[in-house]
Curated annotation (Swiss-Prot):
It is found in: Cell membrane. NCBIfam families: membrane protein insertion efficiency factor YidD. Pfam families: YidD. Disulfide bonds: none annotated. The keyword Cell membrane applies. It comes from Tropheryma whipplei (strain Twist). Could be involved in insertion of integral membrane proteins into the membrane. SMART domains: Haemolytic. PANTHER family: MEMBRANE PROTEIN INSERTION EFFICIENCY FACTOR-RELATED. It is a peripheral membrane protein. This is Putative membrane protein insertion efficiency factor. Keywords: Cell membrane, Membrane.
Amino acid sequence: MLRIVPRNIFILFIIAYRKIISPMYGPVCKYYPSCSEYCQNSIANNGVFLGAAYTFMRLVRCNPWSKGGVDMPRVSTKYRVNKFGFASRKNV
């Protein structure tokens, strides 16, 4: 339970960014999923620190010289993303 709370707090900020700031720029990301969606899924599946590290590596790859394409985040076996985009523990 305590591991899910920090994830969902960060995910709440990402959702706010995607709803408020991201529409001002339009769809400019050359990767699928977009960098903010990648960050949201990465933090939900892997935790705040590891998810932030994966997101940082993704942002470094997102530059004018990259080709883009499909780049899915790594998926955890312990957590899942619910229909609202927040992390919850998988029922084993």
